[in-house]
């Protein structure tokens, strides 16, 4: 199931003295089965797009198409609710959304809210708990007694229990230590391999290079560049003009290039760099 934004604009607090336009005539397609990243500075419109994808925001103009459902400025909540089951949204610091007295109850809430029986919702909750790498033994614990990393996994399990076709991630590893970040990104990779479409907002270019199949560069509410990570990270001068970085290994390759080493194309992952060194 893919998503497309067609000439989408969005204005915060429209019609008030405080109105601010966040998106300008945005057109982009997120292909079914892709792992699509959005990069750009704070205020570029990335997080606004995330909340348009599952109907939390309605476009001021233009439309968002999710499968065969159209979201526009006139869409009603009853039309949008089924989309929120298909498109799971993981905010930054999703653990702040936890509320129930037990882990099981918290994870099962979403499916039950969409009409799933309590028994099936709890079964889904246990499956999702295992999927995010947590033990069934945590089911009766208060989520607020868990570590920060465990709380985040419980929050993500609550989204996965709704069995979304698309998972939208807004800086999902913010605040985690390196090991926790690695484990979570590995989980998202496995979910992508299982057939879930992933949409990632991040400022970590190494994650874009390692995991994404497509990347969109945002600036001041506009899409300024799209392509594969390999293609986008070749445009070093353009990215630096936008004050955006490249993967660490690409930066290292640029330093080697300055010393006379020649690359047919700049490597964007460590594996690619090693391949170039070994085979030329």
UniProtKB/Swiss-Prot annotation:
Asked whether the keyword Cell membrane is assigned, the reply is: yes
User: Which positions are annotated as binding ATP?
Assistant: 40-47
The EC number of this protein is 7.-.-.-
Identify the catalytic residues: 171
Could you name the domain of life of the organism this protein comes from? Bacteria
Segments traversing the membrane: none
Residue limits of the ABC transporter domain? 3-245
What InterPro entries does this protein map onto?
AAA+_ATPase (IPR003593), ABC_transporter-like_ATP-bd (IPR003439), ABC_transporter-like_CS (IPR017871), ABC_transpr_CbiO/EcfA_su (IPR015856), ECF_ABC_transporter_ATP-bd (IPR050095), EcfA2 (IPR030946), P-loop_NTPase (IPR027417)
The record gives the membrane topology as: Peripheral membrane protein
What would you give as a GO molecular function for this chain, any one?
Answer: ATPase-coupled transmembrane transporter activity
Q: Name one GO biological process term.
A: riboflavin transport
> Which keywords label this protein?
ATP-binding, Cell membrane, Membrane, Nucleotide-binding, Translocase, Transport
Please name the top-level EC class of this enzyme.
translocase
The record's listing under SMART domains reads: AAA (SM00382)
For this record, the Gene Ontology CC terms, alphabetical, are: ATP-binding cassette (ABC) transporter complex; plasma membrane
State its location(s): Cell membrane
Q: Which family does it belong to?
A: Belongs to the ABC transporter superfamily. Energy-coupling factor EcfA family.
Outline the subunit composition: Forms a stable energy-coupling factor (ECF) transporter complex composed of 2 membrane-embedded substrate-binding proteins (S component), 2 ATP-binding proteins (A component) and 2 transmembrane proteins (T component) upon coexpression of the components in E.coli. May be able to interact with more than 1 S component at a time.
Q: Which PANTHER family match?
A: ENERGY-COUPLING FACTOR TRANSPORTER ATP-BINDING PROTEIN ECFA2, HEAVY METAL TRANSPORTER
Describe its function: ATP-binding (A) component of a common energy-coupling factor (ECF) ABC-transporter complex. Unlike classic ABC transporters this ECF transporter provides the energy necessary to transport a number of different substrates. Expression of the complex plus RibU in de-energized E.coli allows riboflavin uptake.
Q: What is this protein called?
A: Energy-coupling factor transporter ATP-binding protein EcfA2
| Lineage, highest ranks first | Bacteria, Bacillati, Bacillota, Bacilli, Lactobacillales
């Amino acid at each position: 199931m893919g998503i497309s934004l067609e000439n989408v604009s969005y204005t915060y607090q429209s019609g008030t003295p405080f109105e601010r336009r966040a998106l300008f005539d945005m057109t982009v397609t997120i292909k079914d089965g892709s792992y699509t990243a959005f990069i750009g500075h704070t205020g570029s419109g990335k997080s606004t797009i995330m909340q348009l994808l599952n109907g939390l925001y309605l476009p001021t103009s233009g439309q968002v198409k999710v499968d065969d459902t159209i979201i526009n400025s006139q869409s009603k909540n009853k039309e949008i609710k089924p989309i929120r089951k298909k498109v799971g949204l993981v905010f930054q610091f999703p653990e702040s959304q936890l509320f129930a007295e037990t882990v099981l109850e918290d994870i099962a809430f979403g499916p039950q809210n969409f009409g799933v029986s309590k028994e099936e919702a709890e079964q889904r909750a246990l499956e999702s708990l295992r999927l995010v790498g947590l033990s069934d033994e945590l089911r009766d614990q208060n989520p607020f007694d868990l570590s920060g990393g465990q709380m985040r996994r419980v929050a993500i399990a609550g989204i996965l229990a709704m069995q979304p076709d698309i998972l939208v991630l807004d800086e999902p590893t913010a605040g985690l230590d390196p090991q926790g970040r690695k484990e979570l990104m590995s989980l998202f990779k496995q979910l992508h391999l299982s057939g879930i479409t992933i949409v990632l907002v991040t400022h970590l270019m190494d994650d874009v290079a390692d995991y994404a199949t497509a990347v969109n560069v945002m600036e001041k509410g506009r899409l300024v560049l799209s392509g594969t990570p390999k293609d986008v990270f070749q445009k070093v001068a353009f990215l630096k003009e936008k004050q955006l970085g490249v993967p660490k290994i690409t930066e290292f390759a640029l330093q080697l290039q300055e010393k006379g080493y020649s690359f047919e194309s700049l490597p964007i992952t460590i594996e690619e760099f090693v391949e170039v060194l070994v085979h030329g």
